[in-house]
Structures are given as structure tokens and as C-alpha cells.
Amino acid sequence: AIYETVKERYDLLGKQVIIFAGQGNNGGDGFVAARLFAEEVPVVVLFFGDVEKLSEEAELNYNKIKDTVPILDIRTKEDLANVHFQKRLKFIFIDALLGTGIKGDAKEPICYGIDLFNSEGAIKVAVDLPSGMDPDTGESGEKVCDFDMIVCFHDLKKGLEKFKDKTVVVGIGIPDSDV
């Protein structure tokens, strides 16, 4: 759903996609997007977390891309020294760091990812909700990812009502009766 929505809205020609992924299900959605984008454009995954702590869904999708898509593991601030964005390239950043299950402010290493995400000029797309934002209230934590568009799964999160003009809601096959 992320890949299709971004492709409908933005021209991928000449772009490089950078997936900022965490270790939960939101990160798993980022890994799925990485696999699909990699069929068309260069993709790099910046993984902020511990492979040993991946959710079941995230681990499944991580394993599908680990041999075909470059993944940089970032656990410390020092690991960021290996990340450089060439200014001549045009980027699409995908925020798949945190999902709806996170409450409170982002912790290390996720906060490093949010800082890096916000520091560069790129088209910025959030998966389900911007990392660092409360899904119920729409309030931002100490750090929150910037966004040009939010690709929201199944329905508009309660806290994102004020951002509905920048939000695309996509179905992912969950019947209303199961929500």
C-alpha cells in the first residue's frame, strides 16, 4: 500500500528511496515497501533497532530483503557517521520507525532516526502516522518526524483528523468487524 500510494503521488524517476525502519510492525511495513520500491529505484534501509528484537511480522519481512536491499544497522550516534546523503540526489524518505503502539517520547536509537529524517531535504512520507506523534491526540512528542504525506492503514487515526488533507487512507484487507 505504501509503494502504490507513493508511486501514484510522486514521480519515482531519478529518486532514491530511504526507508527509516524500527523493529516493530511499522518497521515491517517499511521492509515490505523497500522490497517493492527496489524493483524500480535504488533503495537503502536505515534500521534503527536490534534485529534480535524484531516483531514477528518485521522479522519475516526483514529476512525477505536482507540479501537484496542494503540495510544499515544504527544503534548508536556513532553509527550515524556512516550515513551520508549525496546532495546531487533526490530522495524520498519513508518514516517506518514507530507505529500506533508506542506511547511517550521516542528513545534512542529512534530519536537519532527522527533527527536524521528531519535534517535532510526530501519528499517525506509517514507510514500510518508520523513517528513521535500520539495516534489518539495528534500531539507531538519531544521529537516527531516531518511529513508531506501520511499513508494511513485501514482508517484515519483519531489524532490525525487535523492532518486529513495530507493523509491518504488505504485498505489493507481488514474487515470493519475486526477493528
Positions of the model-derived regions?
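Nucleotide and nucleotide-moiety/phosphate-recognizing core
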Residues: 3-97, 105-127
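YjeF_N-associated NAD(P)HX repair module
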Residues: 90-179
